[in-house]
Amino acid sequence: MKNPYLSIVIAGRNDNYGGDFNQRLQNTLDWISHWVNHYHLPAELIFVNYNPIAENDSIAEMITFPVATSYFSTRIIEVAEDVHQELLEEGIRKPVPFFEFIAKNAGIRRAKGKFILCTNADVVFDPQIFEFLSKQNLEEGVFYRATRVDFNSKEKLIFAGNEANFLAQVHRNVFKYFMRGGTYLLKSPLSLYTTFRLLNIYNFVRRLFYTAIYPFRKITRIFYIPFSEELFTFQYACNASGDFFLMDKESWLKERGYPEDTWIATHCDSLHLLMTAVSGVRQKNLPWLVYHQEHERRFNFDTENHDMNLMYHHLLANGAVMTSQKCSFNTNTDDWGIFNYDLEETNV
């Protein structure tokens, strides 16, 4: 497709990350293809195949990528192992085999769409999001966010063309909500969106409370009132922002994508959101949810981890300065997104 309205960028590799990456990715691809074609949304999917493992089957052998239609096309962009090796920098990036946000930047730099949506390879969007996008009324100079919820089940859910059944199972198995300024573990007997609306009200009041007592945070700690270190966590939709971040291409290029000099990927999405917001791009939050398929992960928020602590304090320190001084710290060079390399590309 020469002139898609929307480019959807995701990244991954042929390592079956978390033990079931292939099935999660297949769900995501099938879901996107189904709804893009259903709503006649001119879109391209860009899958950045980062540092593939030579001895494993290729990602094209593991996954059935959607066939091209008059409304939808798929491009696979490969970042080969030798390119990955060139990106290893001691003391700058932890030497892991997958640099998530450099991979996404590679897709962003090469996207053809007027608007670019970055998401993850195991996220499915509420159908109303596709309907909204199909109206082609997105604004330039605005970034769009959607709240992520996590779902799991005893048996892995597989989307096999029955969207109503799949979505009903997803709704029944939601157990975690990533709201602005707070994450909530909650299994509710109410419908998902009723629960979400009630939780939004509670979270709004909670944000007002913590914003009000922020000037007195040193005193409140004496009374054991838990407090996030910085006010910006309540002001901006940083929580799980890497699962849905939509913006016009011109703004993506102006902001130079995600920061590429972070030690690990954790909180890189939050840093990027703050960099974008303080640069004057307006924030809009969509009223619909995106559904993340729960899995085992490399960096887990539930366990103590030095690298994650390091990145969290990096976020707090830099976020506080950026939001108070309204200045961005993105140090990406002009060749961000591996733009100085001619990457191999396959059209599906």
Indicate where each model-derived feature is located.
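N-proximal low-complexity "stem/linker" segments adjacent to membrane-targeting elements
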Residues: 1-37
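Cell-envelope/extracellular polymer assembly enzymes that use nucleotide-activated donors
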Residues: 5-9, 44, 271
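A conserved acidic beta->alpha catalytic loop
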Residues: 15, 38, 48-64, 80-84, ...
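Active-site-proximal specificity loops/subdomain of glycosyltransferases
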Residues: 57-110
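Conserved catalytic core of nucleotide-sugar-dependent glycosyltransferases
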Residues: 95, 108-109, 126-260
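Short aromatic/hydrophobic "clamp" motif used to bind/position activated sugar donors
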Residues: 116
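Catalytic metal- and UDP-sugar-binding loop of GT-A-like glycosyltransferases, i.e.
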Residues: 119-121
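C-terminal catalytic/acceptor-binding lobe
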Residues: 226-227, 233-242, 249-250, 261-348
